[in-house]
Amino acid sequence: MQFTRQQHWQFLEDELKAETEEYKKKFLSPAMSLLKDSGEMFVGQLVALKDGEMIVRFSNNRSLPRKGEFLLCMLLQQELRNYRNWGDCTYRDLYKNRYNASDSVCIWHSASPDKEYSLVGFSRVSLDFAQQVAETPGVILVFAPQRPPIDYMLNLQRLVREELTPSLSSVLDANYQCNPQSNSLIKSEDTADYVYKQLLLTNSMILQGPPGTGKTYLIAELCARLCSEGKSVLVTAMTNRALMEIAGKPALSQMLQSEHVFKTNITIDEHKENKHLEPISHISPMPSCLILSTYYIASGFAAELSLPLPFDCVIMDEASQALLAMFGACKKMGKRCLWVGDTKQLAPIVSLNRDRIRFGEYGHMVDGFNLMVESGKYPVFQLTKTYRFGQRAADYTGLFYNNTLIANH
């Protein structure tokens, strides 16, 4: 089974269209209609930035953002901060005239001393955006429907158009056969040392980690060891939460204190959680340093690379959530690659429906991790000791892993 570059590109194009179809209607809609008619756009005044949250005051004359709703927060040009000046402007027009913007999520509502207004708290606001608006207390902010993650798809499309990068071709152009091998079970007491030694023997390997087997701890320990040897390391994951879990592990405490751990797109709540985590606007390999970045940003770095393999090691966490092309991006970025995931977890969530995936034969391009494991092209190692369950629960969970799990007593 082999995919042409056109097949790779077409899958990403179809997914891109599916993701943007509904959003495009809103993006081209009059902003006043979204504000007054559908209640999908909101205008508020910054009150404070406190304890990792952004507090904004909204009028009770219109609907408020719903708790749990993800929104794009925009700082517009001075004239457009007054919605009465919007006229026929569309959401797209406002977006083009933003000074800065950040993703945000509504987390609470509260009454205001002035009964005509309500206070709303937001988290996940980027640190650079928060620092900019903090300079102008009381500034007017506009909240709009969040953009779908189209940059991820666009970055991967650029990558699949590259045909002269051997490391990328080793994933995208490979002839995959269903040739599953038995996972090599890791029974060593020092799993991080075992994985480290195996990584020295191959330039790419897969680590299968059932629930509670210490994948995050292992990644942190491995990063600390590699960086202590002067290596440059990139860890990429689907979510910022996974990256923050890694940053919070004890193995990285010394590196954090010495300002050797960096993360892209740090939010104010992440900064509150880990004040020693260094913000970095662009990915750049540095000796003895660890960089944490999501697939969305790391894929852009890979697409921009003119010279491949800048990092000594790239570790992909949450690999079961990665599209096949993202594995190619990792190969382009790192001399050595470690993919960490669990084939029993959910495959990547895509907007294309099942019929379209089946008709286009896109299944393996969606579930890249399972294809990599089943093909037998790379050595696969499995963690066997679970720290989350007793033996009885480990036995039940182990039914999905050929009865290989044992509880850590």
Please identify what each model-predicted range represents.
Residues G212:
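Walker A (P-loop) phosphate-binding loop of P-loop NTPases
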Residues K215:
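Conserved lysine of the Walker
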Residues E229, A237-R241, Y296-S299, L309-C313, ...:
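Conserved helicase motor core of SF1/SF2 NTP-dependent helicases
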Residues L218, L222:
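Hydrophobic positions on the alpha1 helix immediately C-terminal to the Walker A/P-loop
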Residues N82, N179-Q181, A224, S232-V314, ...:
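Conserved P-loop NTPase motor core of helicases/translocases
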Residues Q2-E15, S59-L200, L256-T264, N274:
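Pre-ATPase regulatory/linker segments immediately N-terminal to the P-loop/RecA-like helicase/translocase core
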